[in-house]
Amino acid sequence: MNIISFKSCMIGLMSALLSGCLVGPNYHRPPAPAPAQYKELPDWTAATPADAAPKGDWWTDFHDPLLDELEPMVAVSNQTVRQNYENYQQALAEVKVARAQLFPAIGITASVTRSGGPGYTGNGVAATNGNSVINSATLEGTASWTPDLWGKVRRLIEENAAIAQSDEATLANATLSEQILLATTVIELRIADANIDLGQKTVEAYKDSLRVAQAQGTAGITATPPSAVITAQVALETAQSTLIGLGVARAQYAHAIAVLVGKNPEDLDIPHSEAQPTLPTVPAGVPSTLLQRRPDIAAAERTMKAQNAAVGIAVAAYYPTISLSGAAGFSQSPLQGLLRAANRVWSIGASGTETVFDFGERHAEVQAAKAAYEAAVASYRNTVLNAFADVENDLSGLRILAEQAQALDTAVHDAIRGTQIALAEYQAGTVDYTTVAVAQETELSDQQTQLSIEESRLVDAVSLIGDLGGSWSDSQLHNP
């Protein structure tokens, strides 16, 4: 029996055995709770739901040059994303490891031995000195294989492939999360810049008010008590102190942005800007599309599939394991003519093992695998429910904040007008400085609240994009 015939025999046997059965339950995605429409959008229905998903680089809708520059860097340089990428690569390698178990392990063994002792020489002639030297060599090809009769290896491949897809979705979710965090932090920095601008304008306005109070007292136009000047002075000093403190938050936002794009804070300089991001319109689509658009939902669903395959692996332990092995090659002593046909040697064998009694271990393993699957189902459904709640929160937040912003715009306009009137009346001597101070505090408070609402609306818009899955869909998952 030569090596070629041996390999042909093994390949034929392997092909026959690969058609074995597949034990364990086949995977079917369980239904997930999905409402017909969002509660916060009761009167809206998309004619083409897929067209409602954000497309491509969603951050460009905010029209902020800093976002346009930095967002693409997240997928390349962010270390959290990098960590998840390597986890995904590891999972892909595990799929290859599992798939390799379907095939025989083939090796080669070579040995050369020289031994001596009483007896004959290597040529079979009696040694004259009573000692002999024998030279021998062996060259063999070996193969061993455990055929996947019951589908244990195929279930392992299925499990690892699902884990790899789950890790791929987790990578997409990590990338999206870091991009959303970057957009949120950039918005916070832009609002910090706006608060600094407001603080500078407030300081200048309070300086003017102090000069007016001082001038009123000096000119004797009206009875200006020292307390009026002190009140104006304190307001100015407080505004100056607040302005200085605003730099702390801005610096922290800039440092956080640097880390998100994989840079040291000292390597990223973000200049002050008066421009603010534009609030985009984010179409929510219909709830059913959310199941395909959120990578965390896809990751949870793939985890379910992996746990289902694990049940099959546990069930396969009930069945016997058959192993095949063989070797073919040459063996000769002495060394001359090792590869001659007369020196051929071969062996082939099979073994089987089956656990007869294990005190319930295999049954417990199956029960544990089934429980893990049911836990994965619950986790999947919980992820879906939380996803819908996230979107509803974003939609309600945007709606309520829009109403609040509209009401506050009127209040800010009236507050500015009120400060102007109070100053004019103070200069005319009809009111004291307390009226001016109160008007200025109201104006500043309303303007700060206005910026806070603007920030909340922008952050909610970013959050809605993230909670809708960005521009991702489960069609982007690869088959490992």
Predicted regions span which residues?
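Small/polar-residue-enriched beta-strand and adjacent coil segments characteristic
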Residues: 23-26, 57, 63-73, 82-85, ...
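Periplasmic alpha-helical coiled-coil/stalk elements that build and connect Gram-negative outer-membrane
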Residues: 153, 169-286, 397, 401, ...
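Alpha-helical heptad-repeat coiled-coil segments that mediate oligomerization/polymerization in large
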Residues: 225, 387, 391-394, 429-433
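A glycine-biased, small/acidic residue-tolerant capping/turn segment at secondary-structure junctions
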Residues: 272, 413-438, 462-479
